[in-house]
Amino acid sequence: MATFVVPVLNVGGMLGPDKNGVIKYIDGQVQTFDTVDVDMICIPDLEGMAKSLGYPKYTAMHWLHPTATNMEFGLREIKTDSDVNQLRISLVENGCVDFHYEHFLAL
């Protein structure tokens, strides 16, 4: 049986410390995408989501493990198919994860 999820991307903000020094996503917005089958998620699809939001190039792609107590220890980089498999497992277990893309600012 297929498991469907809604990808959630954080855009327009930045990762930085709050007043207590805890790393948070600051001043961004949340963008959701159409429902996808977890088994069909792949790196090119995740790259396509970033491009559709105006981020044609990025330096790193991350997902936030939903059970993490903070972003400093909860961000997981996506580089390989194995990383995507860990993402899929978390999506099935938790129903949702947030995606973050490191990118250069266009000036």
Spans of features found by a protein language model:
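Phospho-regulated scaffold assembly regions enriched in serine/threonine/proline and acidic residues
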Residues: 1-107
